[in-house]
Amino acid sequence: MIRVKCLGHIGTSVGAREVELQEDIMDAAEVVERLRSLSPEADPGFTKYNTLVLVEDGEAFVPAGAKRTVRNGDNVVLIPFSHGG
């Protein structure tokens, strides 16, 4: 299971501040896309291009520009670019 915390408008869009994905291994971009698919909105307003991903080890990145594997047991935080500093 991969535990994902959704900050700002991402949590509002998804309808939950925390989501558990029943996957053993995923690419970080796939995590963002999976969360987008959970949103009832036609255009959730966050993508792999405008979302910071913070993984267990403290590395923050934009998944469209970096390849990063997320594994079972990892905690991930999705942060919108417009997060207020």
Name every feature range the model reports, one short phrase each.
Residues M1-G84:
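Ubiquitin-like/PB1-type beta-grasp interaction modules and other compact soluble beta-rich domains
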